[in-house]
UniProtKB/Swiss-Prot annotation:
This is Phosphatidylinositol transfer protein PDR16. GO terms for cellular component: cell periphery; cytoplasm; cytosol; endoplasmic reticulum membrane; lipid droplet; nucleus-vacuole junction; phosphatidylinositol transporter complex; plasma membrane. It is a peripheral membrane protein. The lineage of its organism: Eukaryota, Fungi, Dikarya, Ascomycota, Saccharomycotina. It comes from Saccharomyces cerevisiae (strain ATCC 204508 / S288c). One of its GO terms (biological process) is response to xenobiotic stimulus. The gene is PDR16. Residues 135-295 form the CRAL-TRIO domain.
Length: 351
């Protein structure tokens, strides 16, 4: 079960060192190194090759819904889905399923169906996604979720602030979270495919309380979000730092504890100084960093949407230029180099 630790006091702000900022940080700073990838064993490589072969089949069809399945709902892979089916995607699912081949293939297939049904299978609204920036914009008017900076291992940071909740509980809140997860993935540098969550449960008096609504989500919503994160974003969470946790939030965490898989629990850090995990020049000054960040929705939101779209455009153009095939590496797709660092086996690849 979760253990509660006494919160350490963070150093006060030094106004002389603060950096005023109101938009996302576009690129990973040169001072942060990306950890090296652990090489695959011979057996792991064989399993990877089998997964690649399966999803490279030109006759492959996938359901358009995670739960409601019929033969009429089987559709071939679209170009954007092939761009999602990367080398690192296969490895994430293989690790999450403990290298059980059938489980891995089934999980990826299920996620493809879920992404179609949820409305995010086209890698951005410019390609046809139903979850758009305009749809969820109202959810972020209070700045309850913010993508800002990178932590020590080059993971982009997504701040979650339940205390800035500004809307009633609805499916749109889940859509908003998924939208932000997709956007923080856009910000990942070449060589890093996981993210960091910084979750602050502090209450913010400047955000009016929504009548009849708790700032701690209902258990049903919590379970749905956990299902999405653990099933459809496996191995994406690198670290989750939680702070200012009130008793109500502890109660919520205890209630959802049985639904959190052991690997996810290991990545949760409670009430430790954020500066232990994030460089000060990448961290909000509220948590001991040097970034004097103030959320202005009219400034931040358009900048986030535009920057993320630029990154997706870069990714997709490189996907097409490298052959538009399943199994390309995110290192190559997010990078700027001209030649493939991770070429796909020609006998397995297909357009």
């Amino acid at each position: 079960m979760f253990k509660r630790f006494s919160k350490k006091k963070e150093a006060p702000e030094d106004p002389k060192n603060l950096i005023n900022i109101d938009k996302p940080i576009k690129e990973l700073p040169a001072s942060i190194a990306i950890p090296k990838e652990k090489p695959l064993t011979g057996e792991q490589q064989k399993m990877y090759d089998e997964v690649l072969k399966h999803f490279s089949n030109p006759d492959l069809k996938v359901y358009t819904s995670e739960k409601n399945k019929s033969e009429d709902d089987l559709k071939p892979l679209e170009e954007e889905e092939k761009a999602w089916l990367t080398r690192e995607c296969f490895l994430r699912y293989l690790r999450a399923t403990k290298w059980v081949l059938k489980d891995c293939i089934d999980r990826i297939t299920m996620t493809l169906a879920w992404r179609r049904e949820f409305g995010i299978s086209h890698l951005g609204e410019e390609h046809g996604d139903k979850i758009t920036a305009d749809l969820v914009a109202v959810e972020n008017e209070s700045g309850k979720q913010v993508i800002l900076g990178y932590e020590n291992d080059a993971r982009p940071i997504l701040y979650l602030k339940p205390g800035r909740q500004n809307t009633k509980t609805s499916h749109r809140q889940v859509q908003h979270l998924v939208f932000m997860l997709e956007r923080v993935i856009d910000f990942m540098p070449a060589g890093q495919d996981s993210l960091a969550l910084l979750i602050d449960f502090k209450d913010y008096p400047d955000v009016p309380k929504v009548p009849g609504n708790s700032k701690i989500p209902p258990i049903g919503v919590g379970k749905e979000v956990l299902h999405i994160l653990q099933t459809h974003y496996p191995e994406r969470l690198g670290k989750a730092l939680l702070t200012n946790i009130p008793w109500l939030a502890w109660t919520f965490l205890k209630l959802i504890h049985p639904f959190i898989d052991p690997l996810t629990r290991e990545k949760l850090v409670f009430d430790e100084p954020f500066v232990k995990y994030v460089p000060k020049n990448e961290l909000d000054s509220l948590y001991g960093g040097d970034l004097k960040f103030k959320y202005n929705h009219d400034v931040y939101w358009p900048a986030l949407v535009e920057t993320a779209r630029e990154k997706r455009d870069h990714y997709f153009k490189r996907f097409q230029s490298f052959g538009g095939i399943v199994g390309l590496s995110e290192v190559d797709l997010r990078g700027t180099h001209e030649k493939l660092l991770y070429p796909v086996k020609s006998e397995s690849s297909t357009v």
